Amino acid sequence: MMQPKKTKFRKAHKGRIHGVASSGATLSFGQFGLKAMAPERITARQIEAARRALTRHMKRVGRVWIRVFPDVPVSKKPAEVRMGSGKGSPELWVVRVKPGRILFEIDGVNDQIAREALTLAAAKLPIKTRFVARIAE
């Protein structure tokens, strides 16, 4: 699972996701990618599940780039604990994704396999996504 080695603060505010992605909105490494179409918090487990689906369908041919990293801790109180007495302990790590952000990029496979693999990966994510391809130059 992906998580930061060290952070400045243990706990983070909930926050809101406003606007569209300005950085990370274009393909940088691969020929094909998966673009987010809605704002959402994506967990490290969901990213890992999508990565596994991607690499298994590609049969470990080609290259995969994960363009997002879960760096925001989400705290949670234990079950059946009364309200108050402070914020809960960090439970999981998420990334706040804005619409237009590229989540995954792949290269070294043909168009059909790339489309199938990214569709499988998209099914593991709690967000509406779109398949994008680099325009032939």
Swiss-Prot record:
GO terms for cellular component: cytosolic large ribosomal subunit. One of its GO terms (biological process) is translation. It holds the Pfam family Ribosomal_L16. The keyword Ribonucleoprotein applies. PROSITE patterns: RIBOSOMAL_L16_1, RIBOSOMAL_L16_2. GO terms for molecular function: rRNA binding; structural constituent of ribosome; tRNA binding. Keywords: Ribonucleoprotein, Ribosomal protein, RNA-binding, rRNA-binding, tRNA-binding. The keyword Ribonucleoprotein applies. InterPro entries: Ribosomal_uL16, Ribosomal_uL16_bact-type, Ribosomal_uL16_CS, Ribosomal_uL16_dom, Ribosomal_uL16_sf. NCBIfam families: rplP_bact. Belongs to the universal ribosomal protein uL16 family. Part of the 50S ribosomal subunit. Binds 23S rRNA and is also seen to make contacts with the A and possibly P site tRNAs. This is Large ribosomal subunit protein uL16.
